[in-house]
Amino acid sequence: MSPNIRPFIAGNWKMNGTVESLGELRAIAAGVSSDLGHLFEALICVPATLLSRASDALSGENLLLGGQNCHFDDCGPYTGDISAFMLKEAGASHVIIGHSERRTVYQESDAIVCAKVQAAWRAGLVALICVGETLEERTSNKVFNVLTRQLEGSLPDGATAENVIIAYEPVWAIGTGNSPTSAVVAEVHDFIRHKMCSRFGDDGRKMRLLYGGSVKPSNAFELLSTVHVNGALIGGASLKAIDFLTICDVYRKL
């Protein structure tokens, strides 16, 4: 944790969830709106097909909603794509950009990520920007070179603590059940914090840095209590309210 930075817990449902899943979303919202809510902010990034329905279902709740990706243009001949303005209109306040699955499967470069962040800002969305190394890059001692390239290339000038959240997600930990030690996470988050302070000054000191990569109830306390970790980006464990809220409950003990 970092003093004076309100924690942020984000869930990424990826390509999971239908209308029936709104029950889980309501349960998450109910838990967040209870006495837990004042301890942190919570966000669920649902599939685009659910966003408008979820926004209507959760009207007046404390749970934030977000998209999982957006195009770098505001409109145009891009079959199948979704703009940041469309996400905003459907009820999103945030959007995940640069997730490792987008960087690898869809070959999204840092320049594309940067352009998408600017598109998110134009629409009034907060950009949740993901960075992280592969297993090969870690074993080759290239972690900090990779992070430097991603941070410098993916974040436009004008980033502030209000329009950007950064998530460190080691690619080798995502969906594998394996997560780095708290010492490794602390080292990386300290590096990211230093980079943000050097470039963005006071805003860099206030930016929320999340950890993402096989976060689950069994390791949440260790990860969320790590220095410079201001929350989590949760994948599979965000699909069930009981798992997501168990992770959130860690903030009662910190």
Swiss-Prot record:
An annotated Gene Ontology molecular function: triose-phosphate isomerase activity
A Pfam family recorded for this sequence: TIM
Domain of life: Bacteria
Catalysed reaction equations from the record: D-glyceraldehyde 3-phosphate = dihydroxyacetone phosphate
Pathway note: Carbohydrate biosynthesis; gluconeogenesis; Carbohydrate degradation; glycolysis; D-glyceraldehyde 3-phosphate from glycerone phosphate: step 1/1
Residues reported in the UniProt entry to bind substrate: N12, W13, K14, G175, S214, G235, G236
InterPro entries per UniProt: Aldolase_TIM, TIM_sf, TrioseP_Isoase_bac/euk, Triosephosphate_isomerase, Triosephosphate_isomerase_AS
Keyword Metal-binding: no
PANTHER family from the UniProt entry: TRIOSEPHOSPHATE ISOMERASE (PTHR21139:SF42)
Subunit structure of this chain's protein: Homodimer.
Protein name listed in UniProt: Triosephosphate isomerase
Source species of the chain: Bartonella quintana (strain Toulouse)
